Amino acid sequence: MSGREGGKKKPLKAPKKQSKEMDEDEMAFKQKQKEDQKAMEQLKAKAAGKGPLTGGGIKKSGKK
């Protein structure tokens, strides 16, 4: 090994794996995840229109 041939012999990035065929369980799981994400975004949008949750009741000044 001479001085010019130092360093890593392996490439830094591993080659990408080929996309495998998904079976029925994986397809159903991915579909369920997409539906859950859509539902969460709808709930977030609905909740964003409302004001803060707290704010009712008697406010105390903190003075004694």
Swiss-Prot record:
Composition-biased stretches, type Basic and acidic residues, lie in 27-44
Q: What keywords is this UniProt entry annotated with?
A: Coiled coil
Asked whether the keyword Coiled coil is assigned, the reply is yes
Show the segment(s) annotated as Disordered. Answer: 1-64
Q: Highest taxon of the source?
A: Eukaryota
Is Iron among this UniProt entry's keywords? no
Instruction: Write out the biased-composition intervals (Gly residues).
Output: 52-64
- Which residues lie in coiled coils? 21-50
| Family to which this protein belongs | Belongs to the TMA7 family.
Query: What is this protein's record name?
Result: Translation machinery-associated protein 7
Q: Taxonomically, what lineage is the organism? A: Eukaryota, Metazoa, Chordata, Craniata, Vertebrata
